[in-house]
Amino acid sequence: MSLIKNSFWNLAGYAAPLIIAIPAMGVIARLLGVEQFGIFTLFFAVVGYASLFDLGISRAVIRSVAIEQGNLAGIHSILGTSTILVAASSLLALLLIAGFNTTLVQWLSISPEYQADSARAFSILAVTLPLVLLSSVWFSYLEGMSNFRLLNMLRTLSGIFLAVFPLIGVWIH
């Protein structure tokens, strides 16, 4: 695929979710109020910084898969090993966040009326982190194979879901 086509898919992968996320965040902010929206954005930051538990493996997968193109056994080995390593490190993140969710809520000085919901939300966040980190490894496979069209279609969908699902959840709750 040409550089222009790959650039188009990369741009689309970031632009489409952004177009949906900006108004969705405005609505969520109005519905939640200042403190709850602050907690909500903190969770997005935690997901963003969760890449620390990736240990740089996703970047290594991109390079290794690109080098091993055509060697199916080598690619399977790379994906298997990286999946196991990231699953183990993300399990550590899950245990830390789930184990200290009430401590985190107290440390953040969250108002008493939001503490129970916030502790539950931290538990849900903890369970989703392994999925986020594993998807990063598997997206890296597509990037290493230079399958930018499929990669960015998936990124676009996941970005849209990250904007729309919280909006639906807040609207229903």
Place the predicted regions along the sequence by residue.
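Signature of the first transmembrane helix
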Residues: 2-63, 90, 94-98, 128, ...
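Residues at alpha-helix boundaries and short interhelical turns
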Residues: 31, 36, 69-72, 90, ...
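Residue-level recognition of membrane-helix boundary sites in multi-pass small-molecule transporters
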Residues: 36-39, 81, 120, 150
